[in-house]
Structure formats: structure tokens, C-alpha cells
């Protein structure tokens, strides 16, 4: 989907989320606590959110929220993000794309 690709490529960190999802809240909080200013798309609030969710599923995202893209690349969901954080790979990745300055 062209719209999805445009959304992903416009910012260094993009999170697809739903307000009703506790794991989405956790992932958003993690990035914000790092000092990152992610672009967040709440799929339960935006136009064509269901369509975007289906496009994420076609990319292999399961569950479809939260889904994180860093530097235009699919990182994955909460499990993948937390694994990167715990093995200390997340911060260097954020620095490489200019999302984190420290």
C-alpha cells in the first residue's frame, strides 16, 4: 500500500498503535521515556485505520499493533522491541537514524 509506505518513510520512528491496547501504551511510553519523538498513528482513531491495519498484517505483523518502524525498516511488535531494548540494541539503532542524540 502506497499510503502505508509513505507513512513509514516520512519519519525516523513510526509506531502504529491503538488506544485500547496496553502493549501499544507500553511501547509508546518506552520511546517517549528515551526522549524519542515518534510519529504515532492510532489506528482506532484515524481515517482508513482498518485498511492500514490490514496492510500491516500483509507485511507479516501479527498482532497488528503495536508495530514499530525505525528508519523506514520494520522492527516488529512489542516482543521484538523489548528484545532489542533488553539486549541493548535499541538505543544504537535510534541513534543511527537520528531519533536519539545521546
UniProtKB/Swiss-Prot annotation:
Entry annotated with the keyword Nucleus: yes
Question: Where in or outside the cell is it found?
Answer: Cytoplasm; Nucleus
For this UniProt record, the keywords arranged alphabetically read as follows:
2Fe-2S, Cytoplasm, Iron, Iron-sulfur, Metal-binding, Nucleus, Redox-active center
Q: Per the record, GO CC terms?
A: cytoplasm; nucleus
One Pfam family, short name? Glutaredoxin
Q: Spell out the molecular function terms from Gene Ontology.
A: 2 iron, 2 sulfur cluster binding; metal ion binding
Q: What is its main location?
A: cytoplasm
| A GO biological process held by the record | response to nitrate
Motif Responsive for interaction with TGA factors: where in chain: 99-102
Q: Where is the Glutaredoxin domain?
A: 1-101
Residues engaged in binding [2Fe-2S] cluster: 21
Query: InterPro entries per the record?
Result: GlrX-like_pln_2 (IPR011905), Glutaredoxin (IPR002109), Glutaredoxin_subgr (IPR014025), Thioredoxin-like_sf (IPR036249)
Which PANTHER family did the record assign? GLUTAREDOXIN
Described function: May only reduce GSH-thiol disulfides, but not protein disulfides.
Family that this chain belongs to: Belongs to the glutaredoxin family. CC-type subfamily.
Q: What is the protein's name according to its record?
A: Monothiol glutaredoxin-S4
Tell me which species this is from.
Answer: Arabidopsis thaliana
User: In the UniProt record, what gene is named as encoding this protein?
Assistant: GRXS4
Amino acid at each position: 500500500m502506497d499510503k502505508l509506505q509513505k507513512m513509514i518513510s516520512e519519519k525516523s520512528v513510526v509506531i502504529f498503535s491503538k488506544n485500547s491496547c496496553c502493549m501499544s501504551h507500553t511501547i509508546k511510553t518506552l520511546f517517549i521515556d528515551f526522549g524519542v519523538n515518534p510519529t504515532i498513528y492510532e489506528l482506532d482513531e484515524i481515517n482508513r485505520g482498518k485498511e492500514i491495519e490490514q496492510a500491516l498484517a500483509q507485511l507479516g505483523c501479527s498482532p497488528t499493533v503495536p508495530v514499530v518502524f525505525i528508519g523506514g525498516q520494520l522492527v516488529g511488535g512489542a516482543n521484538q522491541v523489548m528484545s532489542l531494548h533488553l539486549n541493548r540494541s535499541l538505543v544504537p539503532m535510534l541513534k543511527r537514524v537520528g531519533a536519539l542524540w545521546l
